[in-house]
Amino acid sequence: KVERTDGNCNAFFNGNSINFYTQAGGCNTLAIVADVVYHEYGHAITNYFYNALGTQFRNGAVGEGYSDVYAITLTDTPVLGVGFNLNSPNVIVRRYDINPKIYPQNLVGQVHSDGEIICGAWWRTARNMNSNSGMMEIFSESLYGLANGPNGSEGVVYTDILIDALQADDNDNNLANGTPNLNAIVNAFAFHGIRMLANVQFSYPPLADIPAQTPAPFNVTLSITPPFNTLISGA
């Protein structure tokens, strides 16, 4: 629905339709701002996709972040909302090429702000791959992992999304030997504070008694559960 008059300066998906307010309050009619349209349509894609696979999408931050992924990929720009403000054409809604949001320090409990963390990870994945289309292939396939969780569980859900991304990128059913774009994905997500938890074991030989303050070098063996061994091979 376009040209709604019961509000201004916003647009929304209500579970059944996407809606855009008319020009008012110093804001353009958002139905003519392309990335806003893509963003709201992205909400519909996410919700209908999860519903079609038998579950209900629940996480607001991920929903906002995913909608931004669609918008910045289709417009091929990290800047969202150019043109929505009639009085200040330089005012924007969000951008992803500066001031990145990082988990957990930038998690504030506001879905649009927190969504910048996960969208930023996907945006940086595309930059690392030098390919929006390549990133979107992984992103689209990763949706089948159905990463989900209530608001407030973003730390767990973001990590699940990273794992889903690697599984989507995997081409031989063996994460232990890495994936074609493993470094691009892992480094992008890590830049935004999203990392996988590893099972780490240390082993070392018995240590002899040595005088205090005396250097005593010894060898330590570090075992890391795959796929983390791939990331540190040769280190």
Regions found by a protein language model. Give the residues of each.
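Alpha-glucan (starch/glycogen) binding determinants
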Residues: 235
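Buried hydrophobic-core signal for structured, non-transmembrane domains
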Residues: 39, 220-222
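Extracellular protease catalytic domains of secreted zymogens
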Residues: 1-209
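Extracellular acidic, Ser/Thr/Pro-rich low-complexity tracts
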Residues: 222-230
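Short, solvent-exposed loop/linker segments at the N-terminal edge
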Residues: 207-218, 230-231
